[in-house]
Amino acid sequence: MRRRDLIKAATALTAMGLSKSSSAIAAESMTPQSARPAFKAAVMRLPVLVPPSEDALNDVRRRNAEAMVEAIENVMRSASSKPRVISFPVLQFTSARRAVSGVPMSRVAVDLVSEPLDKGIFAPVVEACRRHNCYVATSTQEKVPQKEGWFFHTGFIMGPEGLVLRSPKAQAQSAPSVAYLRDIKDEYKSIFGENSIMPVAKTPIGTLACFVEGEAEVLEASRLLASKGAEVILHTSMEDDEIPWTALKQAIGFQCHVFLLTGATSRLIYADNPAGEWAGGSATIIGPDGRLLAEKGGQDEGYAVANIDLAAIDAAREKFGRNTVPAWDLYTDLYSQ
């Protein structure tokens, strides 16, 4: 019964725009545009340094953190108005391809929950969030004190208040030593709470969510976040050209009626290859009608910005929702057959 109750709640939330009375719709049309947050957003396409050894790990983390802060300051100076939310690529602190550097996961992984983020390696970015009143997403290899030996690839959002949310990968491919929530979901929920898998967070700029890399390839992940009320999904990623990423992300924006902000790695920089190894894909901002609003890709680095108006979500749901909002009860019954 619990599952059906959750599904019914999801149906009510995602379809709420479809059952309004004409008087309610008329009243909404008279509401000032400022009733829904509107702001600028940015996505980053940036390189990341890979530590050549365990001894170099702390120095490389420091340099990666400094590069993140520099990127934030650059977009804040250059944009016509300061972005309120920024999506960075994956592993922007700790770097990608842990196995290449030979550093054990127990040394690379960081603890996000035991102490405030402004007391550790993330402090410079949290301080930048406070200076500019913005939210920043990236990911990290994570260890949790509640369960020794568990390692996650975790997307997380920082803001002026510190840690806003953390969301370990649920099923998308990752390093061999990374745990998937699909395999430990019951034990994970018993430790972190019933709503701890793929959470959302209410903020002054709307309801935010975060996922990592290939989780965007699983439509159920985006649907779940939308059913929980997510309005802006921050997608922290590194992409290759074998996957039609732009088409996939546009489908998420349209089918779920969310803003999807993807930060993507441009290059992996090694000690013996300072020019770096280029990654594929692009950093993108997708609107709730599926349109590509901004992009930074190819062998190009920096940021892309776009204006976000959450009223566009309501407009997309009203226009397309009769087709795009799932009949949850129907599909759940069919899935279970």
Label every PLM stretch briefly.
Residues D5-A26:
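N-terminal export signals
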Residues K20-V43:
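C-terminal segment of N-terminal export signals and the immediately downstream linker at the start
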Residues A38-S53, L57, G206-E215, L234:
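Active-site-proximal beta-strand elements of phosphoester/diester hydrolases
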Residues R62, E70-P160, V164-K169, E239-C256:
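Cys-nucleophile CN-hydrolase/nitrilase-fold catalytic domain and related Cys-dependent amidase chemistry
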Residues L117-A137, E213-A304:
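CN hydrolase (nitrilase-like) catalytic-core segments centered on the catalytic cysteine
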Residues V144-K228, P244-A247, A251, K319:
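Active-site catalytic loop in hydrolytic enzyme cores
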Residues A311-Q337:
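A conserved C-terminal secondary-structure "cap"
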